[in-house]
Amino acid sequence: MNIVVIGHGMIGHKFLEALSAHTVPDLTVTVLCEEPRPAYDRVHLSSFFSGTSADALSLVPEGFFDRPGWTLRLCEPAVEIDREARMVVTSAGDRLSYDRLVIATGSVPFVPPVPGRDRSGCFVYRTIEDLQAMQAWGRTARSGVVVGGGLLGLECAKALRDMGLETHVVEFAGRLMAVQVDDGGGRVLRQRIEDLGVHVHTGKNTLEIVDGESSTHRMQFADDSWLETDMIVFSAGIRPQDALARLSGLDVGPRGGIVVDDQCRSSDPDIYAIGECALWQGRIFGLVAPGY
C-alpha cells in the first residue's frame, strides 16, 4: 500500500506515530513537507525567544524515518492532486502514486488586507523561520506591535517583550480575547497584560501602514489616531489551508476546511484530511488538541 501524507506538522506527525505502531505489509509512506525541518512543537513556539532551540522543539526522534519504505521530503510541498490518476504532483515536478492520501496541511495565518502589510519589518507568527526573521529584525528595533488580541497574539506580545522591545497590542474588537471572555473578564485581562508592560489598544481598525517619522512604520487607524513602531507582527487568526483540496474538487465548507466524516474521509473515499485543515460536523478546530 502506498500512503502519501501532505504536510508534516504536529497532527501530521501524530498520524505517522500511530501508523508506525501497526504492521502493514508492503507499506510505503511518503511525507511531503513544505518547511525545511521536520515537525516541531508549535504550541510552545514562543519559548524560542527565551532560549529554547529549534532542535529542542522538534517532535521527531532521530531515526524515525529510518524505516523501510518511509521517506520524508523537506521543502517539497504538493502542488496538485490528480484524483482520477491517484497521483500527487510535488513542487519538484515528481508524480507520486497513492492508494490512500492524507492531507494534513494545517492552517495559514490570516493577514488583514491592509495596504502596507507586505512592507519590510512586517511578519506573521507561525513557523520557526518566521521567528528567526522576527529575531533578526528585532535586534535593531526599539518597538513592536502585534495586530490581534487573541490568545496567540498575546503569546506573541510576550515574545516581543522577551526580545526587549516596547510592545503594543492592537485589537479591532473592544476587548482582548473577545471570543473567550466577557466585558468584565476583558477588563481584568487588559489590566494584567498592561501590568506586564504591554500597551493595549482596543477598538482599533488599521487603515494603512506607511513610513513613520521616528520609527520604521506608522499605523493609521480609522479614528484618525496613529501608532509608530519598528516592527509589526500579524496574529489575527488562522484559516484552513485547503487550496489543494479546492483545486482538486474536494468538498470544502462555505468558510473553508475540507469536509470529512467521522473517519476523517473526504468526499473522495481515498483521501483523508486531519488537523486544522479539516471540517468535521461543520466545525474547524484551530488547535492541535483534537488530534492528540
Q: Where is each model-derived feature located?
A:
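Nucleotide donor/acceptor-binding cores
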Residues: 1, 27, 100, 120, ...
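Beta1-alpha1 glycine-rich phosphate/pyrophosphate-binding loop at the start
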Residues: 1-71, 157-180
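A Rossmann-like FAD-binding core segment of flavoenzymes
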Residues: 27-28, 72-89, 96, 163-260
